[in-house]
Swiss-Prot record:
GO terms for cellular component: plasma membrane; proton-transporting ATP synthase complex. Belongs to the ATPase A chain family. This is ATP synthase subunit a. The keyword Chaperone does not apply. Coiled coil: none annotated. It comes from Yersinia enterocolitica serotype O:8 / biotype 1B (strain NCTC 13174 / 8081). InterPro entries: ATP_syn_F0_a_bact/chloroplast, ATP_synth_F0_asu, ATP_synth_F0_asu_AS, F0_ATP_A_sf.
Length: 274
């Protein structure tokens, strides 16, 4: 465990691996994960932020390098893989997005690959990076799966929500957007309060469900790996962890795909002219 506590029971082990490396922005000091003080608005999960930024930069570097060295001849394995991903995302956008914006395909590609990379961190041995963080860098806690942190998934969903508002106002105008919120589904002024409540809930539910769906699935997957490592004897862990890891590959890919698809669909709905 960390220098500030020792693992004595499976409960301690599980709790340790569910603690984020947190920074108190008021004092710029690391938060002791074993202190009883609750997290506040000024508490930053710097491990989630660090890994999400690093993986995002890795995505940009690799795809930029492949694009710069692309050849019309026989492509290498990396170029082939990148072209397959780009083709898959491009076809998905063509099928689901009916607007005119040219940034949706690059956005969808970024969302899919970035979320997939963050999800794939769940396939690393559960103790590997936390052990390195503790014994090499002296970190009191470390979580390595950014999408198992609700603040990360809701932040990404918030970005999608801002784009929904942007394209809605861009395509319909401020008046059209307000009319959409106040005159649907009942097209009569007397029902404006009811329409506003119904449409407001429908609009706000999109980013909330988008972020919580990804968080819930990845948190559950991470927790299962922790339970396997914390409750079972070492000689039986591989018997469950290996099959679950193989099945989890499908889950992490599917969750990245769902996040991308819902982003495209929501932006397509926002781009419709009425």
């Amino acid at each position: 465990m960390s220098a500030s506590g020792e693992i004595s029971t499976p409960r301690d082990y599980i709790g340790h691996h569910l603690n984020n490396l947190q920074l108190d922005l008021r004092t710029f000091e690391l938060v002791n994960p074993h202190s009883p003080g609750p997290a506040t608005f000024w508490t930053l999960n710097i491990d989630s932020l660090f890994f999400s930024v690093v993986l995002g930069l890795a995505f940009l570097f690799v795809f930029r390098k492949v694009a710069a060295g692309a050849t019309s001849g026989v492509p290498g394995k990396l170029q082939t893989a990148v072209e397959l991903i780009i083709g898959f995302v491009d076809n998905s956008v063509r099928d689901m997005y009916h607007g005119k914006s040219k940034v949706i395909a690059p956005l969808a590609l970024t969302v899919f690959v970035w979320v997939l990379l963050m999800n794939m961190m769940d396939l690393l041995p559960i103790d590997l990076l936390p052990y390195i963080g503790e014994h090499v860098f002296g970190l009191p806690a470390l979580r390595v799966v950014p999408t198992a942190d609700v603040s990360i998934t809701l932040s990404m969903a918030l970005g999608v929500f801002i784009l929904i508002l942007f394209y809605s106002i861009k395509m319909k105008g401020v008046g059209g957007f307000v009319k959409e919120l106040t005159m649907q589904p009942f097209n009569h002024p007397i029902f404006i309060p009811v329409n506003l409540i119904l449409e407001g809930v429908s609009l706000l539910s999109k980013p909330v469900s988008l972020g919580l769906r990804l968080f819930g699935n990845m948190y559950a997957g991470e927790l299962i790996f922790i339970l396997i490592a914390g409750l079972l004897p070492w000689w039986s862990q591989w018997m469950l962890s290996l099959p679950w890891a193989i099945f989890h590959i499908l889950i992490i890919t599917l969750q990245a795909f769902i996040f991308m698809v819902l982003t495209i669909v929501y932006l397509s709905m926002a781009s419709e002219e009425h």
